[in-house]
Regions:
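Loop/turn elements at helix/coil->beta-strand transitions in domains of secreted/extracellular proteins
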Residues: 1-3, 16-19, 42-47, 70-74, ...
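Beta-alpha junction/loop-to-helix N-cap segments that form part of ligand/metal-binding clefts
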Residues: 1-15, 23, 78-87, 107-111, ...
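Periplasmic-binding protein-like
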Residues: 1-7, 46-51, 97-107, 113, ...
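Active-site-proximal beta-strand/loop segments in catalytic clefts of secreted hydrolases
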Residues: 6-9, 24-26, 50-54, 77-81, ...
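Extracytoplasmic/secreted cell-surface and envelope-processing proteins
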Residues: 12-16, 31, 56-60, 86, ...
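An alpha-beta-alpha
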Residues: 19-81, 99-100
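Structural motif
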Residues: 30-33, 79-93, 161-163
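Extracellular/periplasmic periplasmic-binding protein-like sensory domains
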Residues: 114-177
Length: 177
C-alpha cells in the first residue's frame, strides 16, 4: 500500500521503502536554508544551536544547520528530556557571542524557550525548523516585542487563491490549528 508523508522531514523515513513517498522538504534542505538565511539576512558569523538530547529531529536538524553554517562557528548544546528551565541555555547563548539562536525543538520546549529568552532579553534572532510553524508558537511569542523569530514552513503564499483564502480562515479561526 503506497503512503505519502506530508510533514516527515527526516531523510531516513523513506529510505529502503519503494512505497513511501513525501511531498515536503527534508531536514538537510531546511537546515541549509536556515544557515544560509542566518548568514545572508543577519550577516551572522557565529550561531548558538540548542537540541534535545536523543531526539533524532532536533539533533539531526542542528547537525545539518551546523554543517551548512560551518561547525567551527557554532556553539552546540543539548538539554535532557524533562527540561523546563532553559534560562541557563539562554544565558549561554548570550555569553557565547553568537549572532543567531537556532533551536529545532518541540512546540512545548519552544514556548518555554521563547518565554525565557524574552525575560532575559536574548538580543538575537531566533531560528527554528518546521515544528515551530504553529499557532501555539505564535501565541507564545505574542506581546514579546524583544523576540525576533524566523521558522521554516510548508506553506507557500500565493500557490492557489481558491485554497489560500479558506485555509487562512481555518488556520486563524482557532489557535490550536
Amino acid at each position: 500500500v503506497p503512503a505519502i508523508g506530508v510533514t516527515c522531514t527526516n531523510p531516513q523515513i523513506t529510505i529502503g521503502n519503494d512505497h513511501y513517498f513525501r511531498i515536503c522538504f527534508i531536514d538537510p534542505f531546511q537546515g541549509t536554508v536556515l544557515a544560509n538565511f542566518a548568514k545572508d539576512q543577519f550577516s551572522a558569523t557565529k550561531a548558538y544551536c540548542l537540541a534535545k538530547q536523543g531526539d533524532d529531529y532536533s539533533v539531526g536538524l542542528c547537525n545539518y544547520f551546523m554543517k551548512a553554517f560551518g561547525e567551527e562557528n557554532c556553539v552546540y548544546e543539548v538539554f535532557p528530556e524533562g527540561t523546563s528551565d532553559y534560562s541557563s541555555y539562554v544565558t549561554s547563548a548570550k555569553n557565547s557571542g553568537a549572532d543567531v539562536f537556532f533551536a529545532p525543538v518541540s512546540i512545548e520546549a519552544a514556548a518555554l524557550i521563547l518565554d525565557q529568552a524574552a525575560t532575559q532579553d536574548l538580543g538575537m534572532p531566533m531560528l527554528a525548523g518546521d515544528t515551530w510553524d504553529s499557532n501555539v508558537i505564535t501565541e507564545a511569542a505574542k506581546g514579546k516585542s524583544n523576540i525576533d523569530l524566523y521558522v521554516t514552513t510548508f506553506y507557500q503564499e500565493g500557490g492557489n487563491a481558491e485554497f489560500d483564502a479558506p485555509f487562512k480562515e481555518w488556520i486563524n479561526s482557532d489557535s490550536t490549528n
